């Protein structure tokens, strides 16, 4: 298959483009200066300056949707660049209480907020839901891993204008899935690249991160002419796995592996094809039999494979993104345009915790024959599953994600604010996302060099190959209408917003390529001729073996007929549905002392499936929020927020749990939506010194879906294992943020000095299991990030040409109480623990700075973990917990989860 070439943007090409534009810009600038100089020399009289009107696009604010802003964090494209955000893990690096859920195979599974994660935190781009985290049920025996997916598609941050992170139930704003919060992205337009009244603009970004040897190259081009405008952004990224602290790589590691060797015992033999003159002539050169034995080997930490591996699994990451947006302004009020987005990411990993060798604990095949060709002792020695001792094993996971979006939009904006509507936005989008999770286990290249691309062939007896693949597709056809109106009535101001939407969605999971293939080669000894001395395996009377005839064996394990209710089921799991919603919001300013906000949303969702064992139905959800801000003085705000959230069962939960047997034995879930209630109190101090905000929050969750069975009247389980609305929980916590301007505190301190502070703590207050259920575990709050505070101190020169910043992060240890739970077994219960490993407290210091060489070129440098501190984050170790998406099991050494040592990120930005 010929690989299609695609355009690669390099640092050199970006620099060449930028230099050309710089030259053109300088030429125009010189011409303008010459004309200006001539005019100045001709004019000696005073002139009256002309009035200049300056307009700027509104910057996203955390109080846009909800008057209190409690639990809200806004990040703009400028702050994303300033914080050198290159991937999903960088986005919330300095935001305590929000963490990334590791998928376990390089990708991610969304965010964790206030004790909940994955599908309980909504993820949207321009109002479009992104893919759910679809975790596939594992096979009953998954000793070598399986294709479990569970990832989400990742967002390209160079296409993003702003990000809003909302902590606490937010379904009145963002609908299904915003049970514990939401992360929403707003895409860029041409206006975000064009500066002032310029008709064209170019931006380039080239970055390098040492922690994963990652390169980022991005080019954005925008222009406008007449009523037309357009934007094109191309971004390419490539990297490897995040490096562990270098101290962890010192030393060597040892292991024992199976080998084949000759043994002086009574099974001597000769090979027929090695005896051209007959059996009798070969007796003097009879060979001792081959047997399986053990050999100890010592290798570097980087080369070691097995459960005790320290270095992270090697990964190759590639990403490409095209983003196009443009349209035509028919007038100052009317605009129509289109959007096209194509992104793809590839996470290719070799799981080196899986031994490249055959372990002595493997069970040998009793059918092993002692013969071998020439001196190749391991040619036919193998273990029970058919893997030969002379080959190396490699376990590979490929996560390939692809997203394509096509949309049109119409915008009406009445800038003089006269009329019924100030602004209306009508958009229609089609979004297709494909997540391809492919597992391959190869055992067909000579030890110690495994190969991803080798396959069993007849010339490699007891070579072996196994694969498994899950392709998840999610499609949304979405229509959205947003209406805005501002009404000013003396001392009362209304900011009214109406939202209507329709989403036609499809979820399809295809299990495929679930197969095993091996080469078998065996032979029985040739019996002696009548009247001759019997061949008994002694040196004087060795066995005579013919050359084995190899043949292929194996099977396709997939059942495509839909008659299997276990992991072998490869029929497409198809769920279709429609969602309608209406939302309204009114943010009011009652004079200068009170702000009041009210918001409601009503969702109706219907689903259907291609088989009766999938749970479908109709859900009606009403969500709301209210907030009030009382401002008794100019320097004090008292805030209160009350909001709700909901989550309908995920597509994976609707499909249910399959454990074999007939389809009529599969439990079909009967679900209620999960719901949440978020309550927050806030106190804010503000003034020339900056602002300080302290808030206390309480989050109550009801009807959380978990794996369980129903309880019968006699106190035993009914055996209908599956997903049920099983649990309720309540969490409380404190959040503190501060931004201080030292010049505002004391005028003697030079302008530009500032400090920041952030702290978050979450505590489990109550949890219980719903009555009538058995075999259910209480919710393990391993999703809670340990308490963390972040202190920043920085300086920006008054000219904004350079600045420096230092950020100190302190994390507490993971609490054992959050990892302990109860497993209810009828009237009895037992303790369960999420994982054996807890993380200790840790702290690091990061420093960063920027320098503008001129108005077009900026250089940024960040040095992270400046003092090379050795630590492990809970987010990394959580991959070993019970609730992990693809749980790392039988971990022998947790050092592999250690964070990077001192590392740096260098970014060159150019704007013209």
Swiss-Prot record:
Domain TBDR plug: 63-188
Keywords associated with the record: Cell outer membrane, Membrane, Receptor, Signal, TonB box, Transmembrane, Transmembrane beta strand, Transport, Virulence
Motif window: TonB C-terminal box: 895-912
CDD domains: ligand_gated_channel
SUPFAM superfamilies: Porins
One term of GO molecular function: ferric iron transmembrane transporter activity
Function per UniProt: Haemophilus acquires iron by extracting it from serum transferrin (TF) in its human host. Acts as a transferrin receptor and is required for transferrin utilization.
UniProt GO cellular component terms: cell outer membrane
Subcellular location: Cell outer membrane
Protein name per Swiss-Prot or TrEMBL: Transferrin-binding protein A
Keyword Transferase set for record: no
Lineage: Bacteria, Pseudomonadati, Pseudomonadota, Gammaproteobacteria, Pasteurellales
Domain TBDR beta-barrel as annotated: residue spans: 199-912
Pfam families: Plug, TonB_dep_Rec_b-barrel
Organism: Haemophilus influenzae (strain ATCC 51907 / DSM 11121 / KW20 / Rd)
Family annotation (InterPro entries): Plug_dom, Plug_dom_sf, TonB-dep_rcpt-like, TonB-dep_rcpt_b-brl, TonB_box_CS, TonB_Hb/transfer/lactofer_rcpt, TonB_lacto/transferrin_rcpt, TonB_rcpt_b-brl_sf
Signal sequence bounds: 1-23
Placement of sequence motif TonB box: 50-57
Family per similarity comment: Belongs to the TonB-dependent receptor family.
GO biological process, any: siderophore transmembrane transport
Membrane topology: Multi-pass membrane protein
């Amino acid at each position: 298959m010929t690989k299609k070439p695609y355009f690669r943007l390099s640092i050199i090409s970006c620099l060449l483009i930028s230099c050309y534009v710089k030259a053109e810009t300088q030429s125009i600038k010189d011409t303008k200066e010459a004309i200006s100089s001539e005019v100045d020399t001709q004019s000696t009289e005073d002139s009256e300056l002309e009035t200049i009107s300056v307009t700027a696009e509104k910057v996203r604010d955390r109080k846009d949707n909800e008057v209190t802003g409690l639990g809200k964090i806004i990040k703009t494209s400028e702050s994303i660049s300033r914080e050198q955000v290159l991937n999903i893990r960088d986005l919330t690096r300095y935001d305590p209480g929000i963490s990334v859920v590791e998928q376990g195979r390089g990708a991610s599974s969304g965010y964790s907020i206030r004790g909940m994660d994955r599908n309980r935190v909504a993820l949207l781009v321009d109002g479009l839901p992104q893919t759910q985290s679809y975790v596939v049920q594992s096979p009953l025996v998954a000793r070598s891993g399986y294709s479990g997916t569970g990832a989400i598609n990742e967002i390209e941050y160079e296409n993003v204008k702003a990000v809003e992170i909302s902590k606490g139930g937010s379904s009145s704003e963002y609908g299904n899935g915003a049970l514990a919060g939401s992360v929403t992205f707003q895409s860029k337009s041409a206006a975000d690249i064009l500066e002032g009244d310029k008709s064209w603009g170019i931006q380039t970004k080239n970055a390098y991160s040492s922690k994963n040897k990652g390169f980022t190259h991005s080019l954005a081009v925008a222009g406008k002419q007449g009523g037309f405008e357009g934007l094109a952004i191309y971004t390419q990224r490539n990297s490897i796995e995040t490096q562990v602290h270098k101290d962890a790589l010192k030393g060597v590691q040892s292991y024992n592996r199976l080998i084949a060797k000759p043994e002086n015992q009574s099974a001597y033999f000769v090979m027929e094809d090695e005896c051209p003159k007959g059996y009798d002539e070969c007796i003097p050169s009879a060979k001792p039999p081959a047997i399986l034995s053990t050999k100890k080997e010592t290798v570097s930490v980087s080369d070691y494979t097995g459960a005790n591996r320290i270095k992270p699994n090697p990964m190759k990451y590639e990403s490409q993104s095209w983003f196009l947006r443009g349209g035509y302004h028919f007038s100052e009020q009317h605009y129509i345009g289109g959007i096209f987005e194509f992104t793809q990411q590839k996470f290719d990993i070799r799981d080196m915790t899986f031994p490249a060798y055959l372990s002595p604990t493997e069970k040998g095949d009793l059918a092993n024959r002692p013969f071998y060709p020439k001196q190749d002792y391991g040619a036919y020695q193998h273990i029970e599953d058919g893997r030969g001792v002379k080959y190396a094993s490699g376990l590979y996971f490929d996560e390939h994600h692809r997203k394509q979006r096509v949309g049109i939009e119409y915008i009406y904006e009445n800038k003089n604010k006269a009329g019924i509507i100030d602004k209306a936005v009508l958009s229609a989008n089609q979004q297709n996302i494909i997540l391809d999770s492919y597992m391959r286990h190869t055992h067909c290249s000579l030890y110690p060099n495994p190969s991803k691309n080798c396959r069993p062939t007849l010339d490699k007896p007891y070579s072996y190959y196994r694969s498994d693949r899950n392709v998840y597709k999610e499609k949304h056809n979405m229509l959205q209408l947003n209406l805005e109106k501002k009404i000013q009535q003396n001392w009362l101001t209304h900011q009214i917003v109406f939202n209507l939407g329709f989403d036609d969605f499809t979820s399809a999971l295809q299990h495929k390529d679930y197969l095993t293939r091996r080469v078998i080669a065996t032979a029985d000894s040739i019996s002696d001729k009548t009247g001759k001395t019997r061949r008994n395996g002694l040196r004087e009377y060795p066995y005579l073996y013919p050359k084995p005839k190899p043949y292929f064996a194996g099977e396709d394990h997939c059942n495509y007929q839909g008659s299997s209710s276990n992991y072998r089921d490869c029929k497409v799991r198809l769920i279709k549905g429609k969602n309608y919603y209406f939302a309204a919001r009114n943010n009011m300013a009652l004079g200068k002392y009170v702000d009041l906000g009210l918001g409601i949303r009503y969702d109706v969702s219907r689903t259907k499936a291609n088989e009766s064992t999938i749970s479908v139905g109709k859900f009606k959800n009403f969500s709301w929020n209210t907030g009030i801000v009382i401002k008794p003085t100019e320097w004090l705000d008292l805030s209160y927020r009350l909001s709700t959230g909901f989550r309908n069962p995920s597509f994976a939960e609707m499909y249910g749990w399959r454990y074999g047997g007939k389809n009529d034995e599969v439990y079909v879930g009967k679900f209620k939506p999960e719901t949440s209630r978020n309550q927050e109190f806030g106190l804010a101090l503000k003034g020339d010194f900056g602002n300080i905000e302290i808030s206390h929050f309480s989050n109550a969750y009801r009807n959380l879906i978990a794996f369980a069975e129903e309880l019968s009247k006699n106190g035993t389980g009914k055996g209908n294992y599956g997903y049920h609305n099983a649990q309720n929980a309540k969490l409380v916590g404190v959040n503190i943020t501060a931004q201080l301007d030292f010049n505002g505190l004391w005028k003697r301190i030079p302008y530009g000095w500032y400090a920041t502070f952030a702290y978050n703590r979450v505590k489990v207050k109550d949890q219980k299991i719903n009555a009538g259920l058995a075999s259910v575990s209480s919710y393990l709050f391993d999703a809670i990030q340990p308490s963390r505070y972040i202190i920043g101190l920085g300086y920006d020169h008054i000219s904004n040409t350079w600045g420096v910043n230092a950020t100190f992060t302190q994390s507490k240890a993971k609490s054992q109480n959050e990892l302990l739970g109860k497993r209810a077994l009828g009237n009895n219960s037992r303790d369960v623990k999420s994982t054996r490993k807890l993380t200790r407290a840790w702290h690091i210091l990061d420093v960063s700075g920027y320098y503008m060489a001129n108005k077009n070129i900026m250089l940024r440098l960040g040095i992270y973990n400046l003092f090379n501190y050795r630590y492990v984050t809970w987010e990394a170790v959580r991959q070993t917990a019970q609730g992990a998406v693809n749980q790392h099991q039988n971990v022998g050494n947790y050092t592999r989860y250690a964070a990077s040592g001192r590392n740096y990120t260098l970014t060159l930005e150019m704007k013209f």
